[in-house]
Amino acid sequence: MALLKISVVVPEGEVYTGEVKSVVLPGVEGEFGVLYGHSNMITLLQAGVIEIETENQKEHIAINWGYAEVTKERVDILADGAVFIKKGSDDRDDAISRAKKLLEDASSDRLAVSSVLAKIESL
């Protein structure tokens, strides 16, 4: 299976870059998955969790909002704010706390935020 290149960038710099099997993005019309060979598109992203599947594991990045450009070979994400939640890292609990704060500040829609926070807590 061909791998998809992905980059997640915020105003402060790069949060994540790599080659992945797939990525699930929190689009404004709902979550959608991207594999290598996906149709080209540019879309708005809402507060949520980006799910990245690599060869060995799943990784997660919480964002408050942003844009995604999808081509057949890559996904470039420009987000206003993002927190990389890495499994097994020493600062995972701190990352989850920062992700919760980022999402709570992102939207006044309590129901949507609660749903995303529940997803983060299950990681």
Curated annotation (Swiss-Prot):
Family of this protein: Belongs to the ATPase epsilon chain family.
Originating gene: atpC
Subunit structure: F-type ATPases have 2 components, CF(1) - the catalytic core - and CF(0) - the membrane proton channel. CF(1) has five subunits: alpha(3), beta(3), gamma(1), delta(1), epsilon(1). CF(0) has three main subunits: a, b and c.
Taxonomy, superkingdom: Bacteria
Species annotation: Helicobacter pylori (strain Shi470)
Protein function: Produces ATP from ADP in the presence of a proton gradient across the membrane.
Name of this protein: ATP synthase epsilon chain
Bilayer topology: Peripheral membrane protein
One CC-aspect GO term: plasma membrane
